């Protein structure tokens, strides 16, 4: 094991190199700080509207370096630092600086943005604050002179003495809906009605029962509810879910109200016991398509009541 004196002799060259490097760095930092101080005092760098947080951080770092330099000077002179008040000040300053680090991280974006704006004179193109609502955009882009000219132009146009001047900003004119000729033929209409009848026939209870009878799949046992009621409940649940998720009330058309009334009436009446769905659209026959064609309401014309002219009764 080497003696303590030998260890100290081995560390002397490394210590000398560190002191030389430290001296060079201190010289550079001193020159840089003096240049900044001169610019601030001459008014080149205006620090009147600076951030108090950064000013406090700079003051704490300066105090920390002063106490640290004082302790290094005491140790270099061979004096003991035990009980030195500078140690307690260093611990206190280090604690405050550590507590300020989360705040520094939160303010980093705002500080960098302000520094960049002060250097370049404008914000970045991708800065999110460029897309925020700007109340200045609500102000009319026309100057008072242009507005006065437009008002005078309208007055002249009404009187007929002069033509209306063309303004740079044109008024918005909504597009007009042009009438379109209805080119639907009778054959296309019949084909559409037949397709609708096939769709209704495939969803009928008769086809569903035949499918369950001849299918090899296991029979699915449901509650004692009709197929049309199950379909109605499914549509009603979908409607409720849409209203609750979108926070909006859906209005029912007259056609939907009539269908709902018809479905509810089928469950409360016994007339539908012997009623079977029309599946002639699947077999090629001519089924009833009267229910698929929208009915045209006819106005009821009754006998007109004769209106007698009321007058004053003569007194005898």
From Swiss-Prot:
It is found in: Nucleus; Nucleus, Nucleolus; Chromosome, Centromere; Cytoplasm. Keywords: Cell projection, Centromere, Chromosome, Cytoplasm, Nucleus, Repressor, Translation regulation. It holds the Pfam family Sas10_Utp3. Residues 145-157 have a biased composition (Acidic residues). Residues 297-316 have a biased composition (Basic residues). One of its GO terms (biological process) is ribosomal small subunit biogenesis. Disulfide bonds: none annotated. Residues 143-172, 280-316 are annotated as: Disordered. It comes from the Eukaryota. GO terms for cellular component: axon; chromosome, centromeric region; cytoplasm; dendrite; filopodium; nucleolus; small-subunit processome. Part of the small subunit (SSU) processome, composed of more than 70 proteins and the RNA chaperone small nucleolar RNA (snoRNA) U3. PANTHER family: NEUROGUIDIN, SOMETHING ABOUT SILENCING PROTEIN 10-RELATED. Part of the small subunit (SSU) processome, first precursor of the small eukaryotic ribosomal subunit. During the assembly of the SSU processome in the nucleolus, many ribosome biogenesis factors, an RNA chaperone and ribosomal proteins associate with the nascent pre-rRNA and work in concert to generate RNA folding, modifications, rearrangements and cleavage as well as targeted degradation of pre-ribosomal RNA by the RNA exosome. Its dissociation from the complex determines the transition from state pre-A1 to state pre-A1*. May inhibit mRNA translation. Belongs to the SAS10 family. This is Neuroguidin. It comes from Xenopus tropicalis.
